[in-house]
Amino acid sequence: ATELGVNKLSFVRMDNSGKQKIQIPRLEKIVKTASKQCGRTNFPSLKEYDSLKDFLYLNNAKTIAAHKSGDRFLSTFLFKNKMKPSSVIIGPEGDFSKEELSLIQQNNIPIISLGNRRLRSETAGVYALTSINEYYLNKN
């Protein structure tokens, strides 16, 4: 994500997230190394949230969510909508809970599809970032 120009990485504890604690100091070292390798002079900030509800309450970014129930592909969404997303919610390996999906819908967050294959969370994030970057680079 650092090499793709992300300004902020948010780690959200989801209902179906694994038990492991996010190691922010370790991730900061990785981000700094990746930034230096790709020639970035600024480093993305890292933020941890205890729940999706906290993230949605404290985050004012234009947000979309990636889920298999999405009724349109990311590329179609980008082409047909004027909203330029600045935040993408990627579910955990265990998927969003019913409550989290309901919360996303209640907040009118568009749910998009990343394709027909089930992707690992890390892969889904890179895929979404790459697709959004590619779309806006080619648009200009």
Where are the language model's segments positioned?
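Short, glycine/charged-enriched secondary-structure capping and boundary segments
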Residues: 24-26, 78-81, 102-104, 127
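Active-site/ligand-binding-proximal alpha/beta "capping" segment
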Residues: 63-102, 109-114
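RNA substrate-binding interface of SAM-dependent RNA methyltransferases
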Residues: 2-64
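Glycine- and other small-residue-rich loops at beta-strand/loop junctions that grip anionic moieties
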Residues: 20, 93, 117, 121
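Residue-level recognition of oxygen-bearing side chains
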Residues: 51, 95, 124
